[in-house]
């Protein structure tokens, strides 16, 4: 059917009271960003719902984008007709017939903001219900949990009909909770952490530590591809790559093997603290899950968090690996994450890292390296890229083959 509008219903915005307008404005901006390449669209974000006027654009493609926008509870493709009951009958019958299968039931739900229209909501329900019963053989009325809900909205600019409700992504509009910085490795966990933070309204920027020649260009491209996948939920993301080679080499040379990982992570956290403050962020996010590996014990977290006063948020902290993998599969990051390109966290990993490092020793071993100079040179080499949904950074088959040779 040729839809004319998509009606969007908000998610958790109803809980925000006097801040509701700000949340709706943020959602409107995010929707416009997600639909930027549909030039004929018009987006009207009103208090109760959002109306997206299609003006001839492809409804299916638009709805595919809307499914990924946080802050949307659900939405319905709609058809506008003139304020004439014969036109309403014709369109409603066609809508119901398109969905009807033997044994199905229906009900009608009418809202009327144009109180000058000649019929009230009960009259519209009765008249339209009678027409559907007369023209759709075998259909029955059911007021509770029907198969088809025909929604009718009588507005000043016409009557809008819809019979399909599509679930949105839920959550809060990206940006309403402030800016966060994600430590994005090439693994399974950190993209899931980023997704979960974005779902709670965080404007997430992606920070990746890059250690050439120990890590390959394919590993960097893989991280950018993960960022592009996550950008589908916000419209675009900033990707920040930090050179980490010199830091890793000096740590390996001067720090005992058991504390290599701890001191390395302390330097990463120092750099994250600096970048987050430069970018006016409010928190650091990572994909640590309690007790999975040596860097993720509580003793390790104490030793690593020691270098920052910013909140370090871990959205997957209590999840099992199977739970994390399930989300990664759902958001299309899993297949990318398991591609065989090593990141900087694995290339210098010692065979037996300390699972319960001591804070005083961590500080003492870190003093053996030139923290100030190393950080200054790393920050001077930072590169930033704006990444949009659908951008291709990784020619999967060719790059995997080349890496394995």
UniProtKB/Swiss-Prot annotation:
GO terms for cellular component: cytosol. It comes from the Bacteria. It is found in: Cytoplasm. The keyword Nucleotide-binding applies. GO terms for biological process: thiamine biosynthetic process; thiamine diphosphate biosynthetic process; thiazole biosynthetic process; tRNA 4-thiouridine biosynthesis. It catalyses: [ThiI sulfur-carrier protein]-S-sulfanyl-L-cysteine + a uridine in tRNA + 2 reduced [2Fe-2S]-[ferredoxin] + ATP + H(+) = [ThiI sulfur-carrier protein]-L-cysteine + a 4-thiouridine in tRNA + 2 oxidized [2Fe-2S]-[ferredoxin] + AMP + diphosphate; [ThiS sulfur-carrier protein]-C-terminal Gly-Gly-AMP + S-sulfanyl-L-cysteinyl-[cysteine desulfurase] + AH2 = [ThiS sulfur-carrier protein]-C-terminal-Gly-aminoethanethioate + L-cysteinyl-[cysteine desulfurase] + A + AMP + 2 H(+). Its EC number is 2.8.1.4. InterPro entries: Rossmann-like_a/b/a_fold, ThiI_AANH, ThiI_fer, ThiI_N, THUMP_dom, THUMP_ThiI, tRNA_STrfase, tRNA_sulfurtransferase_ThiI. One of its GO terms (molecular function) is tRNA-uracil-4 sulfurtransferase activity. Pathway: Cofactor biosynthesis; thiamine diphosphate biosynthesis. Gene3D superfamilies: 3.30.2130.30, HUPs. ATP binds at residues 183-184, 208-209, 265, 287, 296. Residues 60-165 form the THUMP domain. Pfam families: ThiI (PF02568), ThiI_fer (PF22025), THUMP (PF02926). NCBIfam families: tRNA uracil 4-sulfurtransferase ThiI. PANTHER family: TRNA SULFURTRANSFERASE. Catalyzes the ATP-dependent transfer of a sulfur to tRNA to produce 4-thiouridine in position 8 of tRNAs, which functions as a near-UV photosensor. Also catalyzes the transfer of sulfur to the sulfur carrier protein ThiS, forming ThiS-thiocarboxylate. This is a step in the synthesis of thiazole, in the thiamine biosynthesis pathway. The sulfur is donated as persulfide by IscS. Belongs to the ThiI family. This is Probable tRNA sulfurtransferase. It comes from Lactiplantibacillus plantarum (strain ATCC BAA-793 / NCIMB 8826 / WCFS1) (Lactobacillus plantarum). The lineage of its organism: Bacteria, Bacillati, Bacillota, Bacilli, Lactobacillales. The gene is thiI.
């Amino acid at each position: 059917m040729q839809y004319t509008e998509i009606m969007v219903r908000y998610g958790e915005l109803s809980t925000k009271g006097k801040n509701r307008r700000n949340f709706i404005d943020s959602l409107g901006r995010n929707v416009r960003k997600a639909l930027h390449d549909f030039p004929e669209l018009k987006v009207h974000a009103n208090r109760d719902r959002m109306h997206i006027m299609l003006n001839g654009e492809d409804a299916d493609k638009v709805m595919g984008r809307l499914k990924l926008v946080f802050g949307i509870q659900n939405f319905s493709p709609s058809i506008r007709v003139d304020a004439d009951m014969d036109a309403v009958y014709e369109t409603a019958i066609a809508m119901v017939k398109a969905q009807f299968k033997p044994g199905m039931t229906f009900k009608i739900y009418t809202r009327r903001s144009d109180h000058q229209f000649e019929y009230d909501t009960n009259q519209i329900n009765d008249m339209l219900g009678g027409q559907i019963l007369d023209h759709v053989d075998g259909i029955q009325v059911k007021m509770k949990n029907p198969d088809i809900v025909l929604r009718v909205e009588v507005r000043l600019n016409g009557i809008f009909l819809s019979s399909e409700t599509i679930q949105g992504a839920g959550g809060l509009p990206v940006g309403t909770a402030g800016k966060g910085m994600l430590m994005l490795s090439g693994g399974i966990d950190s993209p899931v952490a980023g997704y979960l933070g974005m779902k709670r309204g965080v404007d997430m920027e992606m920070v990746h530590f890059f250690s050439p020649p120990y890590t390959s260009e394919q590993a960097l491209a893989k991280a950018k591809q993960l960022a592009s996948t996550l950008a589908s939920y916000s419209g675009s993301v900033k990707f920040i790559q930090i050179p980490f080679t010199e830091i890793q080499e000096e740590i390996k040379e001067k720090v005992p093997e058991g504390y290599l990982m701890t001191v390395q992570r302390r330097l990463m956290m120092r750099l994250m603290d600096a970048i987050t403050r430069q970018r006016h962020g409010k928190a650091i996010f990572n994909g640590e899950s309690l007790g999975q590996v040596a860097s993720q014990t509580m003793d390790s977290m104490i030793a690593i968090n020691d270098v920052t006063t910013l909140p370090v948020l871990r959205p997957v902290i209590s999840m099992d690996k199977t739970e994390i993998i399930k989300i990664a599969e759902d958001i299309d990051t899993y297949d990318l994450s398991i591609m065989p390109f090593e990141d900087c966290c694995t290339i210098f990993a010692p065979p037996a890292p300390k699972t319960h490092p001591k804070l005083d020793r961590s500080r003492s071993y870190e003093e053996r390296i030139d923290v100030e100079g190393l950080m200054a040179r790393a920050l001077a080499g930072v590169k930033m890229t704006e990444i949009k949904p659908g951008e291709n950074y990784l020619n999967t088959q060719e790059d995997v083959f080349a890496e394995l040779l």
